[in-house]
Amino acid sequence: MNSTKFLCASILALAVSLSLLLTLSIVDQVHAAKYPYKGQLSGQNEVPPVETSATGEAEFTVPANGSMKYRVNITGLSNATAAHIHSGAEGQNGDIVVDLLNTPTSKSKDTAYGMIFRGNFSDSSLKGPMQGKTIDDLAAAMDSGETYVNVHTTEHPDGEVRGQLSNVDKAAAGSTNSTNATVGFSTLTE
């Protein structure tokens, strides 16, 4: 009798544990972005490259509401004069498509190591070759590797750090080593 109770309790505990794991996985997937994009920023990515110790990471997501949410974290500089998404393939300069420091919700703050800025924008914030288009059009350009983030400073008015944007999910799907594909990805939080 006791062994039957123990077996039932063990099965119940296992079922609850599995249910909890599945629930957390589903919740994580529900909260996952429609398109997670990321770019690693450095002076070596500038065209032409610039000497700087500054580096950074830019992250973009498309929540269900049709806007694009972003977070840019930079170390080694705190004096950004401008930050944009530009159109252009790797190694090419292109037109500004979004001004990241002047969106209606943009916030920036200096940190002990650099600066962070974040916010979100909608179709109406798109300019240049994206003017009149949608966030989904911008996401398609990001998917094809045709966009980059550029952060400008007084010392480097054409850009101090730059990073090509890519779809993290597509990169992970194309990777044979899923551990390497997901290392360093962080979720945007306000």
Question: Where are these predicted regions, by residue range?
Answer:
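N-terminal secretory signal peptides that target proteins for export/translocation
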Residues: 1-6
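Bacterial N-terminal signal peptides
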Residues: 10-25
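Metal-centered catalytic cores of metalloenzymes
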Residues: 22-83, 87-190
